[in-house]
Design a protein with these regions (language model features):
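Membrane-interface extramembranous regions
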Residues: 1-139
Length: 139
C-alpha cells in the first residue's frame, strides 16, 4: 500500500511541477508580471523553470539519495515561499496550489523509504511504520 501512496503522491507532485515549469516557459511574460506583483524580479522565471524541471528529474531518477533529498528540501522552501508570497499580498486563494504541493511533498517524502531500494536517512522508518499503522491492511 505504501508503494502506491508514494508513487501517486510523487506523480502528482511531479505533474504539478512540470505543469508549472511548462507554463513558465510558454507564458513567460504573464509569469514575469505575476512574479512582479508578488515583489519578485522577472529574471527568476528562467531560473525557476529550470530548477523545477531538475527537481522532478532528480526525484524520479533518484540517482543519488542526497541529491533527491536536496530536491525535496528545495521544493519545500519553494512551496513555503510561494504560499507566503500569495498570502502576503492578500491573495490567499492563489496559495492553494502551494498548499496542495506541500501535502503531496510531505506524503512523497515520508513514504519514499517504503517504495525505494536506497533509503533516505532523513525519512525515518518510524514514519513509514506510522503510515502503515494508519492505512488499511493489504487492500
Amino acid at each position: 500500500m505504501e508503494h502506491y501512496v508514494y508513487w501517486v503522491s510523487t506523480a502528482l507532485l511531479s505533474l504539478l511541477y512540470l505543469t508549472s515549469a511548462v507554463m513558465y516557459i510558454t507564458k513567460r511574460n504573464w509569469v514575469r508580471q505575476a512574479l512582479g506583483e508578488l515583489g519578485y524580479p522577472g529574471y527568476l522565471v528562467s531560473i525557476l523553470a529550470a530548477v523545477k524541471l531538475l527537481a522532478v528529474a532528480v526525484i524520479l531518477s533518484r540517482l543519488h539519495v542526497a541529491l533527491s533529498d536536496l530536491a525535496y528540501a528545495g521544493m519545500f522552501f519553494h512551496l513555503m515561499l510561494a504560499a507566503g508570497a500569495h498570502i502576503g499580498v492578500h491573495k490567499a486563494k492563489e496559495a492553494v496550489p502551494a498548499f496542495i504541493g506541500l501535502v503531496l511533498l510531505s506524503v512523497s517524502f515520508l513514504t519514499q523509504n517504503a517504495a525505494r531500494d536506497i533509503r533516505s536517512p532523513y525519512a525515518p522508518s518510524a514514519v513509514t511504520h506510522l503510515v502503515a499503522a494508519i492505512t488499511p491492511d493489504k487492500v
